[in-house]
Amino acid sequence: MKYFIITIDTEGDNLWRWKPGQEITTKNVRYLARFQELCSRYGFKPVWLSNWEMINDSSFVEFINKNVEMDSCELGMHLHAWNNPPFYELPRGEHSGAPYLIEYPREIMEAKLTAITEKMKEQFGYVPVTHRAGRWAMNQTYFELLYQYGYRIDCSYTPGISWRDSMGQTPDYAGPDYRDVSKKVQKIHGITEVPVTVERTHRMFLDCNKSWKSNVKTVLF
């Protein structure tokens, strides 16, 4: 039997344009029910991979709790390092982008995971088992910390895609290269890695960065 898993990165409005000190709104919460209803109509159970500002939105918490109670969705965790407390200043490169969590010292990575995990417990009463890294970036330390905090499934690998052109914040820090990772489910440091399905296409339907354009591929969530 083959399984069809739908995962949704669930985060604040226009998060990629956010600058430190600006408010991150979550108006998109009011539209999530439409997609949930569509999934439920066809018997699909989506995984809402949710980041810091979303799990602090009372309407979102109510939406998730209602649908989890009906067994129509699953809650997952999604961590964007730049707006997930505690805040820690990294050096900034000349052509830098948003920071990857794996750029931070281990103790800061752990502190950020502690913050969002404890908030999950506070808001929902439990820690979800599924996770996706912000900006897809994983390394050995990240896998080890996820296991330590009770997460058991990751879906950050994008087989066939390199993010080396997607810079982090610190000087010359490039994203991960997943061109050679397996498309099959595998165990990594106790975590079950379920790679994202990647479909080759002739055109892009996203506002792509350079690495997406060079690969000419679309990631299906």
What positions do the PLM features span?
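Active-site-adjacent pocket scaffolds in enzyme catalytic domains
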Residues: 133-221
